[in-house]
Amino acid sequence: MHEKSLTELRAALTAKECSAVELAQLYLKRIDAANSLNAFIQVDPDLTLAQAKAADALLHTGHAGPLVGLPIAHKDVFVTKGWRSTAGSKMLSNYESPFDATVVARLQNAGMVCVGKTNMDEFAMGSSNENSYFGPVQNPWDVKAVPGGSSGGSAAAVAARLAPAATGTDTGGSIRQPASFSGITGIKPTYGRVSRYGMIAFASSLDQGGPMAQSAADCATLLNAMAGFDERDSTSLVRDDEDYTRYLGKPWKEESAAKPLAGLRIGLPKEYFGAGLADDVRASVDAALKQYEALGATLVDVSLPKTELSIPVYYVIAPAEASSNLSRFDGVRFGHRAAEYRDLLDMYKKSRAEGFGPEVKRRILVGAYVLSHGYYDAYYLQAQKIRRIIAQDFQEAFKQCDVIMGPVAPSVAWDLGAKGDDPVQMYLADIYTLSVSLAGLPGMSVPCGFGAGANAQRPVGLQIIGNYFNEARMLQVADAFQRATDWHRKAPAGV
């Protein structure tokens, strides 16, 4: 049962092959057995089974929605009533929220059953899930490798079939990169599609929640429940609700059923295929693009000339926003408080020094520096100007194509500990995802192969980038690929 997708599990529930309680018990046992992966920060069987019993009561009425009774894991950046909400940090290691994040509440209202809170890089700052106060997460495909970050716990949980789906957040690639490294599907929607209310903030102009699951079809179903306007989030977009599954299984153009993607133009940015891209990643992406051609799509060369500037721009803007957002954690209102201190100022210093990890401190320092007098204009304002140019580059590219494709990351997952001493090398791994986030565009990762040689068990993801509000079409394009291939069906050995 655990190998089934969300859609298949829903069919099993409808056919009464299992109950929501039995399904929850199955995944709780699997989570316990795979404890060494460290994918979860907190599991509470009593809370989970209470939700499952409520879901079964709904299922018995015969009028339950498409997600009722299905298990889901929540990234521990979403606050959840009744569970601890830690953001992977000592600072919040004992924090319990009095309310649910909008994303959590919407999925719970849709009848989904929470099986636990997943591990993550502290305050979502990281690309490897090694920055968590609760320890690193192992990649289920190769336990010597990182699962990606910051949503590494969610990615590992779905890959190891510890949950059929999970929530994630993406600030600069934190859904797409772990989805790629862990061989699952994940989508970052257009900025503002999914409410940030109750999502512990890292960089408010970049953070965006999204679903992670086995397939594009599963992600589309989840996005139906997650997306939508929320008056409690000032950046939430006022748009009509839409069905993100509406194009699944349909041809790109109605008259082209024989070639389902005939008429689709796929843009290939030359900047995504240059030096620095590993040969095995290039080979898997090229093979996926050939499959798209077989489905009828046309490949078009495009250019995103400011791609290389996305790293310095991101690492000015995101830390600047983080230094402001994280100033609230002072040991007074909430968060870790030092046991011994001389006065109020000393309490602030010691509480923050003890509560934050080294990567978070590094980014707070960078952010405070670029916002300081004399550097604000030189760094922060300059970065915001280039950010606008990056967004304009994408709009020029979309004049020639319908979607843009390329690798998610320059390499497959690296070994645990391999880049911990060199944060710049870690930052460079986000080269293909950062510009999408800076532009506020939707992007997703779809499994498309594996590395070579010693990396033969480490997955590769294909990145699909759409224009604003084009998620339904992106999911259609991803789903067509998954109907023609089985990469998304593959699971780690022993799972």
From Swiss-Prot:
Q: Which reaction does it catalyse?
A: L-glutamyl-tRNA(Gln) + L-glutamine + ATP + H2O = L-glutaminyl-tRNA(Gln) + L-glutamate + ADP + phosphate + H(+)
Alphabetically list the UniProt keywords.
ATP-binding, Ligase, Nucleotide-binding, Protein biosynthesis
State the coiled-coil residue ranges. none
**Active site per database record:** 75 (charge relay system), 150 (charge relay system), 174 (acyl-ester intermediate)
Q: Which GO terms describe its molecular function?
A: ATP binding; glutaminyl-tRNA synthase (glutamine-hydrolyzing) activity
Per the UniProt entry, the Enzyme Commission number(s) are 6.3.5.7
Which function does this protein serve? Allows the formation of correctly charged Gln-tRNA(Gln) through the transamidation of misacylated Glu-tRNA(Gln) in organisms which lack glutaminyl-tRNA synthetase. The reaction takes place in the presence of glutamine and ATP through an activated gamma-phospho-Glu-tRNA(Gln).
HAMAP family, alphabetized: GatA
User: What family does the Swiss-Prot or TrEMBL record give for this protein?
Assistant: Belongs to the amidase family. GatA subfamily.
Q: Which protein, by its recorded name, is this?
A: Glutamyl-tRNA(Gln) amidotransferase subunit A
UniProt organism field: Paraburkholderia phytofirmans (strain DSM 17436 / LMG 22146 / PsJN)
Q: What is the lineage of its organism?
A: Bacteria, Pseudomonadati, Pseudomonadota, Betaproteobacteria, Burkholderiales
